Amino acid sequence: MPFKIAHISDTHISPEHNRNNIRKLKSLLTYIVDRNYDHIAITGDITSQGSQEELRSIRKLLKHFDLLHSNRLSIVVGNHDIFGGVHRAEDLLSFSTKCKRVNYKKQLGLFQRAFKELHTKDDFNLLNSYPYIKLVDQVAIIGVNSIPPYSRLGNPFGSNGRVDDVQFAELSKLLSHPALKDYSKIVLIHHHFNKYIVQSDGIAEWLYHRFEALTLELHGYRKLLKLFSNEGVSAVLHGHTHIIATYMTLGVSFSSTALIPLNNDNQKLHFNEVTVLNQNNVTIAPVVVDPQKSPAHTSENIPEKW
């Protein structure tokens, strides 16, 4: 039987910014849950600022749909979940200083504890919270943290990516484990592996997105890509760029999506349907949802503050 994953990313939930995104996410989850997908994967930037208030709101929504179960939902962290983000142009110059002050370990811990039910107990003798693995049917879902701590040169705005040497070694050991030889390996990570294309309607917007593109890189992506290819990874699911895309590199299929993508009608909601037929056969197809036609387009069961 095909194993179907609903891939969501970059929901950016916030009571202060993007106030409608909680309703949009509810519409999207209603659509997905009603269609009985085997699993849901959310690849980071679930929150806008990484605050406890935002995390509590998302927990409440996921609990409403009975999704706080390891076999139903997998989540990886994004840069907004650690460092937050810029919502006003005047805050751009001070944002690097804000990132420098972030307690990285504390923020990552808050994120992990917010979704503690989703952690797996599959015993592969892993040392840290990332990478993680869960075995669902004949699919091995592997979560990777691509968000490094602040660095003045390497990660001044918190949005660049890197998988450090310790995590890479664990990931390499995990992907080559003999117990996974009959499983389709699906990797979840926040950062992208394709070229970020700047799209804009004017010079000011172009300059902003051009600056953004220079600070959205995944350092060491070629090394990761080679590992994924050599170890037979079937697909990599990611977000970060807010671009809907499917692409293939070195025999590995990639899924890129966002709740409200830059390259589509921003009144519609989006996710990718990842269908795993076997180790050598994975298909990825974008799905568009009109929230106006969704039964969840209502204030029912939404906290009043939203």
Regions found by a protein language model. Give the residues of each.
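N-terminal active-site segment of His-dependent metallophosphoesterases
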Residues: 1-67
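Active-site-proximal beta-strand elements of phosphoester/diester hydrolases
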Residues: 2-15, 138-152, 186-188, 252-260, ...
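Divalent metal-coordination and catalytic microenvironments
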Residues: 10, 40, 45, 58, ...
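Active-site environment of divalent metal-dependent phosphoester hydrolases
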Residues: 12-16, 47-52, 77-90, 149-154, ...
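Extended active-site neighborhood of metal-dependent phosphoesterases/phosphodiesterases
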Residues: 57-173, 177-181, 227-229, 272-273
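Conserved beta-sheet core of the metallophosphoesterase superfamily
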Residues: 63, 102, 201-277
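Active-site-proximal segments of metal-dependent phosphoesterases and phosphodiesterases across multiple
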Residues: 150-162, 178-232
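A short C-terminal boundary segment appended to hydrolase-like catalytic domains
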Residues: 277-306
